[in-house]
Amino acid sequence: MARVKRGNVARNRRNKILRLARGFQGSNGTLFRTANQRVMKALCNAYRDRRRRKRDFRRLWIARINAAARMNGVSYSRLIGGLKKADVRINRKMLAQLAVLDPSGFETVVAAAKS
């Protein structure tokens, strides 16, 4: 059986990992074995955090809405419940934007939820 030399294949595989590890500190960006470990961990973290980002932003929006709602004399849960009863279909992202950028507009939304 003929001998198979994997020069190009192996080099390309290593260079792909080292390209992904560019910018990593110290040997994590230059040595293949440590770079491979760091890249694997970085890709795992990226995968996890793409899902976590959605949760984190929702928590941020709820905290902002709650703070603005309490300034208008109503809790977050009562505000959301009132909006559902009043059939005001506005999502939490837009409510948070209203609370931060247009407090007077947010007051009208709170008034609609109270009635």
Curated annotation (Swiss-Prot):
One of its GO terms (cellular component) is ribosome. Keywords: Ribonucleoprotein, Ribosomal protein, RNA-binding, rRNA-binding. GO terms for biological process: ribosomal large subunit assembly; translation. CDD domains: Ribosomal_L20. Pfam families: Ribosomal_L20 (PF00453). It comes from the Bacteria. Belongs to the bacterial ribosomal protein bL20 family. Binds directly to 23S ribosomal RNA and is necessary for the in vitro assembly process of the 50S ribosomal subunit. It is not involved in the protein synthesizing functions of that subunit. This is Large ribosomal subunit protein bL20. It comes from Synechococcus sp. (strain RCC307).
